[in-house]
Amino acid sequence: MNFPDFNNNNKDDQWERFSQLLFYDEEIGFWLDISRMKFSSEDIGSLQDNFKEACKSMKALEKGSIANIDESRQVGHYWLRNASLAPSKQTSNSIRNEINDIKTFGENILNGKITTAQGKPFTDVLWIGIGGSGLGPLLIVNSLQDNNKGLNFSFLDNVDPNGINKTLNSFRDKLSTTLFVVVSKSGGTPEPQIAMDQTRFFLDKNGLDWSSRAVAITMEGSSLDQIAENEKWLKRFDLPDWVGGRTSITASVGLLPLVLIGEDIDSFLDGASQMDQITRRIDIYKNPSALLAASWYFSGAGKGKRDMVVLPYQDRLQVFSKYLQQLVMESLGKEEDRNANKVNQGLAVYGNKGSTDQHAYVQQLRDGIDNFFVTFVEILEDCTEIPKINKKSPGDYLSGFLQGTRLALSENDRQSITITIKKFNSYTLGSLIALFERAVGIYAELIDINAYHQPGVEAGKKAASNILKLQSEIELLLEDGKLYSIEGIMNTIPGSSQESIYIILRHLSNNDHTYKFVGNLSDPRELQIKKAV
């Protein structure tokens, strides 16, 4: 295909470029416009061989090759929406059985066949999960739940004491009819464990039983799975080892909230499966995920030199930028390529929603540093319950603001991608998620990195664990009531550092008043500390 180069000063050339590059799929009702990204037909041609190799790798992944070398693990999120792709009959059957189990459980919760121990129907859900275990469900609920449909959802996705306190206290009048869902693949992630412990304590304090209203989503045989089994929790769902957190939205992690808000699981999975079929195509121009990956590649010179700003012009998709932030950055942010060469790859993602952002950072996007490209997301079909008043439709204005922002950026030579969806529902959300999952996989192949491990995340977890261990050692040391300098503590505890000790002590002394600093607070070198005993 030969198309004109990006030329904002020539309307005819730009119209020709737009028309040739516009991708459309009638089945989904989906358009992708990459015409305002700066690449040439020669650039795309130069990627064709690399793209074919990327497709081979993606095909091998779908057939069950080991993709996460660190954990010697398969990556099977594509099987979740088409169980026949799974490499074994046992896995295929397990996927189908799990989907049916989730459907039955959710329907029985909503129709009142499953109730609290007191015979009351469940009214609310408190979802406890971190990272993909929280972001996927949050996206599902925020984007798809209609008014007065299904259960009311709240989330504990952090270990902030103020946030936990505020959320738990918001349940006082409905605590007895709340379903508690705990998500942790390994069962050993500290954040959901801590949030669960606090929630259980809160229930106990209010005279309510935990097990009869608790659900676990975890890997079979994990510590959480064993707890749920031993304590006879209301229900357990499997999260297979071949599903990563950031791609777990089409697993039980996303399907359970779907059914609990009264949405159609099959429609969601069908949308993802349909996009999967489209994005297996070998022709770049007929593969929207390949077009996205190519746009990212040329925009950032294959090095992620430009940020991606995600601007969905729809309130219900406000969480989408956060969801993509994890999917893209955790997958592509890698220090080394697959040959252990230091490459420091990545693609930074941020965003919120239009038209709000037009009154925030779009000023810089148009007139400031040119280090980004925008991904607009547009939904064509407006809410029919909101009428025109004085011949003015909010939907018309929203569309006008999107097109105006796109043009204003383009006039100043700023790049953008526009994704347009005819109608937003569970089917098209599934397709949108699958679009970006495949784009991430293809882009990772183009830059030769492993998209399916997260050594940086693991390093952060290990460092946090070491800090908590150091805090325990400091607390034990200070039990004698003696006065210690920071230097003295460091010399007593091997492998510690002054800075870490100081930061731990500062937090301790502000939350446990038996710890007292002595000295000049503005100079940590002079401080001493002791515990009243």
UniProtKB/Swiss-Prot annotation:
Entry GO CC: cytosol
Catalytic function, reaction form: alpha-D-glucose 6-phosphate = beta-D-fructose 6-phosphate
Pfam families: PGI
Active site: E330, H359, K461
Pathway, per record: Carbohydrate biosynthesis; gluconeogenesis; Carbohydrate degradation; glycolysis; D-glyceraldehyde 3-phosphate and glycerone phosphate from D-glucose: step 2/4
Stored InterPro entries: G6P_Isomerase, Phosphoglucose_isomerase_CS, SIS_dom_sf, SIS_PGI_1, SIS_PGI_2
GO molecular-function terms, A-Z: carbohydrate derivative binding; glucose-6-phosphate isomerase activity; monosaccharide binding
Class of enzymatic activity (EC top level): isomerase
Gene3D superfamilies with a match to the protein in the record: Glucose-6-phosphate isomerase like protein, domain 1 (3.40.50.10490)
Keywords for the protein's UniProt record, in alphabetical order: Cytoplasm, Gluconeogenesis, Glycolysis, Isomerase
EC identifiers of the protein: 5.3.1.9
Classification via SUPFAM superfamilies: SIS domain
Location(s) in or outside the cell: Cytoplasm
GO biological process, one term: glycolytic process
Xref: PANTHER family: GLUCOSE-6-PHOSPHATE ISOMERASE
Function: Catalyzes the reversible isomerization of glucose-6-phosphate to fructose-6-phosphate.
Similarity remark: Belongs to the GPI family.
NCBIfam families the UniProt entry points to: PRK14096.1
Name under which the protein is recorded: Glucose-6-phosphate isomerase
Source organism of this protein record: Prochlorococcus marinus (strain SARG / CCMP1375 / SS120)
Lineage: Bacteria, Bacillati, Cyanobacteriota, Cyanophyceae, Synechococcales
